[in-house]
Amino acid sequence: MATTSEPKRAGGFPEGRFAGLAAWLESRMPLSGVLEFLRHKEVPWHKGTFLYLFGGIALLLFGVQVVTGILLMFYYVPAADQAYESILLISAQVPFGWLIRSIHSWSANLMILALFIHLFSVYFMRAYRPPRELIWVSGFILLVLSMTFGFSGYLLPWTKLSYFATKIGTDVTKVIPVVGEGMRNFLLGANEISGPTLTRFFALHVAILPPIFTIVLGLHLLLIQLLGMSQPIGGAKGKGIPFVPNFVLRESIVWVIVLGLLAVLSVYLPWEVGEKADPLAPAPAGIRPEWFFTFMSQSLKYIPPKVLGMEGEALGIYAIGAGGLIFFLVPFWDGWARQGKRHWLVTGFGAVVIVFLVTMTLLAYLKPY
């Protein structure tokens, strides 16, 4: 009786019409190990598995940022006397320029929102416990870099709101001990926000931050692939779904939905240009930074000018910085998670941080004055 043998493989690819090409590619770009790894990779399956998708959403939106940012650079001029006019040109005369600009702005905000959700979901699932401490550290750094992207990009249109909001943000750095004044002068390139400031922010936004972000992102993704995704404390070990095709299919569907939402927001709620910045004009009433910084500016309003002989604003900045540092170092002080236990102190601290961020942000919009 004749027996059928399994088709031979070339570099992990099925034998067939393109076997020769597959073998040629495998000898020059070995991918069989990667393919074999993906075939056996699993994602933990539990009631919070959907939260893993927010990391992929942030990655997708970062890609959108890169593409739309490059397109905007073709027409944008980083000079105080031409920046606003170049934005008007993009929005009014460049074909689909208004759409590209809206997509860039909306995707930036959605990306930071996705990162916040991703960070807190990892926190409450205690997914930072050993050996995944560096995944948490690199992820936290990515959030900080994303917020820095937002801060540097906000000034580039050179509008009234962006000018005075940036002024508030850079003035805050003066309260940092020792290096504060020097940091402010370095950012501004002058005594006040002017042309050199715009040039420096543009360089930071398009030349300095992108390679740093890409390196940290690469490390973050590499660590996730090497160590895998963490099982929640108390979850059933060994219960998972194949990464390919099950999780990839789910993630692809979510990406399509996110791109659809991004398109709807960009078309029906296009990003406004605003009024041109006038350094000699008074600051408009109710000025505030981007939404992901409003918690900081709003909380400083409730601190008295002097507290125990210290500048109230400086004390507020120190308190926010200390809270951020505690949050950043949670994998190293949460000994309960290392023992596979949850503790109310860690959960309570995370809940307080969320309530603080949400409350201060809402107050900034509901009571701007």
What residue ranges belong to the model's regions?
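Membrane-embedded alpha-helical bundles that constitute the cytochrome b-like, heme-associated redox core
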Residues: 2-302, 311-369
